[in-house]
């Protein structure tokens, strides 16, 4: 009897795991198709200047924290006292429908700076009729652009990295174990995974050191934070307005 129960539990867990994997693949595929369709129906150029970033952002409505949808505040834990204090003076960009696939810096899109969570999936489920809040400090986008420009200036691949964390609302930040006062919550930080920056066909420590050097000396300097995370290909940088450096992820 115990053996049958154990086998039953194992089979149940296998089905649950398979279902979770299938669901994850569904959303990834849906995201890919929507992005492909957007590119087929819209003409976009690489966003290569601060003025171009400003022009794109100006097209979206800016919503003050006090006027955010109560359901959004509750769903994202942004209404909790500690976060209300952090966010009360912030303005969010209201991104309609498939405009999340709009290029915002280089060839990276607004979508790349958004959390891949239930809130995003609800938006993705009904792109024609939904809008999505995005909190971002434009200075972060300018720093991102400057990183790309410096890489290109020095003869390196300017887009050989992947964004895996941008804006994180409080609930998502808590779910993934982020710091309670993370700069991601304020839309001031981005995490990237380094690829083949120097074009030698490999992704190695040398590639990461190139990016870190440019961020440390030119892009961020004393104006922001830099998470170096030794032993990984990950880098964090932010525009907090003062110098901060750390190694532990």
Per-range role (PLM):
Residues 1-16:
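N-terminal Sec-pathway targeting helices
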Residues 22-144, 241-249:
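Extracytoplasmic cell-surface/polysaccharide-interacting catalytic and binding patches
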Residues 24-31, 181-249:
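Catalytic cores and adjacent binding grooves of peptidoglycan-active enzymes
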Residues 142-145, 149, 209, 213:
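Solvent-exposed, polar/charged alpha-helical surfaces in well-ordered, non-transmembrane soluble domains
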Residues 144-177:
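Extended, low-complexity, intrinsically disordered C-terminal regulatory tails
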């Amino acid at each position: 009897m115990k053996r049958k129960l154990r086998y039953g539990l194992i089979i149940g867990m296998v089905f649950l795991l398979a279902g979770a994997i299938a669901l994850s693949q569904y959303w990834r595929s849906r995201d890919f198709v929507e992005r492909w369709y957007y590119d087929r129906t819209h003409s976009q150029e690489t966003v290569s200047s601060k003025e171009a970033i400003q022009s794109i952002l100006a097209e979206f409505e800016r919503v003050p924290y006090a006027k955010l949808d109560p359901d959004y505040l509750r769903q994202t834990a942004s209404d909790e006292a500690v976060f209300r204090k952090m966010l009360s003076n912030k303005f969010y960009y209201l991104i309609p429908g498939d405009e999340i696939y709009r290029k915002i810096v280089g060839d990276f899109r607004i979508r790349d700076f958004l959390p891949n969570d239930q809130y995003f999936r609800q938006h993705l489920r009904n792109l024609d009729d939904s809008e999505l809040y995005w909190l971002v400090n434009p200075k972060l986008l300018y720093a991102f652009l400057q990183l790309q420009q410096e890489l290109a200036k020095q003869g390196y691949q300017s887009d050989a990295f992947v964004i895996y964390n941008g804006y994180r609302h409080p609930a998502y930040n808590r779910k993934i174990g982020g710091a309670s006062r993370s700069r991601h919550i304020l839309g001031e930080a981005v995490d990237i995974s380094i690829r083949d920056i120097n074009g030698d066909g490999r992704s190695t420590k040398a590639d990461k050191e190139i990016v870190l050097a440019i961020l440390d000396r030119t892009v961020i300097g004393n104006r922001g934070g830099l998470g170096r995370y030794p032993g990984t290909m990950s880098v964090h940088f932010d525009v907090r307005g003062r110098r901060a450096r750390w190694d532990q992820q």
